Structures are given as structure tokens and as C-alpha cells.
Amino acid sequence: CPPCTQCRVAPASGSNPSVAEMSTLFDRIAAGPQAYGTLGWNFGGRTTVGAGPGWCGTTGRRDTVPVTFPCVLLKAIYLTESAWRQFCTTNQTVISFDCGYGIAQVTSGMRRGETSSYDAARVASSAAYNVSVGAAILADKWRASPCVGLNDPEIIEDWYFSVWGYNGFSFRNNPNNPMFRADRPEFRTPGVASAQVRSNYPYQELVWGYSRYPLTSAHYRGIALVYP
């Protein structure tokens, strides 16, 4: 995983936590910055999100709640992004061609000449901090995305458009894009039989597939999700 020469921060040296350690880490980050404290980034103070259909132009509750995430959602997103790797086999930070760093493949503010409100060096060096920044970006997508269902952040399926937005809210990830077969089967991860080619699916369907079919049973217990 060679770093892009246009990236802001040099790769850090380190080793990946074990699968069990990563699973525990995701559980802690999913509880939100008010729970995990100095383990990660504080989301720049943006520690609440809107919940309820009242935010969607309809009647119903319109609450503001602390940011939390369904645990399996974070685990599935970051299997999709990096297979839970902060560091390459060379013990250097995973950095993609477009300056995506680490487990969460954080790109915002990570290109040369850009700035960020979070510590870019810690994004490169710390698995916990990296994941917390990725979670903050996902929370921002929730705030900016169309509502699904009851607009309840405790329901994984209600994050559908937020997950789409995490990879870019573009036509490339539109499930009706003609580049994808209309009769495509659900995505199955490389860790199970009948795995499919990732490029044949929009991003959010990869995450839904990883949610049901983790790489191994040690990662988490798979959950089948429905589509909006």
C-alpha cells in the first residue's frame, strides 16, 4: 500500500491490533465521543444528531440525541474500507492512491495543502483515533442525507444514505446505475463461499453484504439487513 506523493502526512510505523482488540475498539467508538473520551477525536464538539421523522418534513418526533452508532455498522463499513487494517504488512500506515488513511480510509483534510480540525498525524498513527474520525465523518453524512424509515440512528437500515455518502453520494453508487446488473445477487464477502466481485456493486451494498457475511466469525456475528 504505497502512499500517494500528494498526501499531507507521512505514514506512521506500527502494528495492527488483533481482531478481538479491534472489535472491542469499534464497540467503544460506537458509543460516541461522550463515552470514549480521549481514546479518539471529540468530533469537533458536534456530538449530537437529529433523530425522528420530524426532521424529514413530516409529522412525528424531532429529537436531538447524542451521536452513537449501531456497532455492526461501523464494523461492516471498515471491513469494506480496509479489512480493519491501520498498517500494511510493512508496518506502515495504509494510504490509498487518493490519500485515504488507515482503517477508516480518511481522505478529508489529508491531502497536501489541506487543513483539518482533527490531528492528521494521529489519523495516520492511531487506530482508535482514525476510526473515531471516520465515525465523525459518518455522523456528518447522517446530518446531510435524506431520511430513511423513522430516521432513527439506532436502526442500522436508517443509515443507508449516510453509508452511501461515506463513499461519495454519487451516481456511481446509485443502485439503479445501469452498470450494475438489475438481477445481481446480494454481495458476499471473500471470506465465504460464492464471493462476488466488489466492482459489480454500489458501495452501500458492499457494506450490507459485509454486515451479513463478515470475513470470519471472530469479527462479529453477521446480521442480515433490509433495503429501504
PLM feature spans:
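Non-catalytic cell-wall polysaccharide-engagement segments
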Residues: C1-Y36, T107-P228
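Structural recognition of the beta-strand scaffold that forms the well-ordered cores
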Residues: L73-L79, R85, G102-T107, L138, ...
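Extracellular/periplasmic catalytic domains that process cell-envelope and extracellular macromolecules
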Residues: C1, P66-C71, S96-C99, I155-E157
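Export/targeting segments at the very N-terminus of extracytoplasmic proteins
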Residues: P3-Q86, P146-G149
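Short secondary-structure capping micro-motifs at structural edges
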Residues: R61-R62, T89-T93, T115-R122
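Short, surface-exposed glycine/acidic/tryptophan-bearing loops
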Residues: T89-G113
